């Protein structure tokens, strides 16, 4: 049986976003979108994907985008794109918009791609991101093969990036019209949906694994960073709306450029449905309901854990001699989440 932690307060983990604001020092309390109704944490049951709080799907998004830039270069994925995303994104964070009762849709490769996300609760999201210096108003432009849009519309917030060599400044209006059709439809169909609570919402990194435990495995003193280089709408969704954390353990000596990277922990509360979409080699980890091992494109090693209805990813890095086996950290993480851990000082 999962134990609820004694303490659920912690410094907000800020997310690396290109062009984001300087990092503030918020201590946000994770909250659900205004359109979802919290319910008690359920007994573990078959994982079910969260319902979007509006009547727009990735099929609808693909239809609009096909009219702008042609058929998708690759099958449309109901997740955030990894084409140019930051290193923490692969895994749980790709599905953060669904956790917030929204959608995220992406397709393409490095030369031609698009990504669109829509999420309810626009007023609170804009207010929070503005307070934390990560939102300065609507964005909408096309130029030199790229279109970037970000705006609230009624009760929803839409973000989009489109890359195609044929796009130019003259396409701004028609792209805006297509995206507004999507946001208007979503805003007009907002409804309340069930929100599945989770014990790991707002949980500090030390409740997953402590610096001391990582040190004992890594063989040297480590520092814990929950801070990155900026804040934006994705940070607001991941950290505040979802209550997830980014926990990055690196050598105590050095800075962000020179330190040795050992472990990153990311999570998707009540994200077992997304865990089941992952591909990897099954691993037996005592206490976990399921575990999958896989590798990243740059030498990283992943271990995905399903614990009850939650998805936790452990990622290790190649520091020059190959990434360490993340299963070394798994017993501690699983024990802490299932049996409890002494509150960190």
Residue ranges and their predicted role:
Residues 1-10:
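Bacterial N-terminal signal peptides that target proteins for export
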Residues 21, 57-59, 104-110, 141-148, ...:
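Sequence contexts marking disulfide-bonded cysteines in secreted/extracellular proteins
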Residues 15-19:
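C-terminal motif of bacterial Sec signal peptides marking the signal peptidase cleavage site
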Residues 21-97, 176-243, 323-345:
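N-terminal "mature-domain start" segment
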Residues 130-200, 280-345:
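A short, solvent-exposed beta-edge/loop patch
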Residues 71-139, 224-300, 307-308:
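Short, solvent-exposed recognition patches
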Residues 28, 50, 62-70, 110-118, ...:
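Extracellular/mature segments of secreted proteins
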């Amino acid at each position: 049986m999962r134990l609820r932690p004694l303490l659920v307060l912690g410094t907000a983990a800020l997310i690396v976003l290109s062009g984001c604001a300087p990092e503030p020092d918020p201590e946000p309390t994770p909250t659900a979108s205004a359109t979802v109704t919290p319910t008690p944490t359920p007994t573990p049951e078959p994982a079910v994907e969260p319902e979007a709080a509006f009547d727009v799907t990735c099929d609808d998004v693909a239809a609009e985008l096909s009219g702008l830039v042609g058929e998708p270069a690759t099958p449309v994925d109901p997740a955030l794109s990894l084409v140019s995303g930051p290193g923490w994104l692969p895994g749980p964070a790709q599905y953060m918009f669904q956790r917030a009762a929204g959608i995220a849709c992406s397709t393409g490769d490095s030369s031609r791609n698009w990504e669109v996300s829509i999420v309810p609760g626009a007023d609170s999201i804009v207010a929070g991101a503005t307070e934390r210096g990560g939102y300065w108003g609507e964005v909408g432009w096309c130029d030199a093969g790229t279109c970037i849009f970000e705006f609230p519309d009624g009760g929803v917030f839409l973000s989009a990036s489109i890359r195609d060599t044929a796009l130019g400044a003259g396409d701004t209006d028609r792209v805006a019209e297509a995206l507004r059709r999507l946001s208007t439809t979503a805003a007009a169909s907002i409804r309340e949906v069930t929100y599945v609570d989770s014990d790991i919402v707002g949980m500090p990194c030390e409740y997953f694994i402590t610096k001391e435990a990582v040190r004992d495995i890594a063989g040297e003193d480590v520092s814990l960073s929950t801070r990155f280089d900026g804040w934006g709408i994705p940070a607001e969704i991941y950290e505040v709306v979802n209550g997830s954390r980014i926990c990055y353990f690196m050598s105590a000596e050095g800075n962000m450029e020179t330190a040795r990277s050992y472990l990153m922990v990311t999570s998707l509360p009540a994200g077992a449905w997304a865990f089941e979409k992952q591909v990897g080699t099954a691993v037996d980890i005592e206490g976990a309901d399921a575990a999958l091992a896989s590798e990243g494109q740059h030498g990283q090693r992943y271990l995905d854990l399903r614990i009850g209805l939650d998805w936790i990813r452990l990622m290790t890095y190649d520091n020059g001699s190959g990434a360490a086996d993340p299963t070394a950290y798994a017993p501690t993480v699983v024990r802490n989440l299932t049996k409890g851990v002494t509150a960190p000082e």
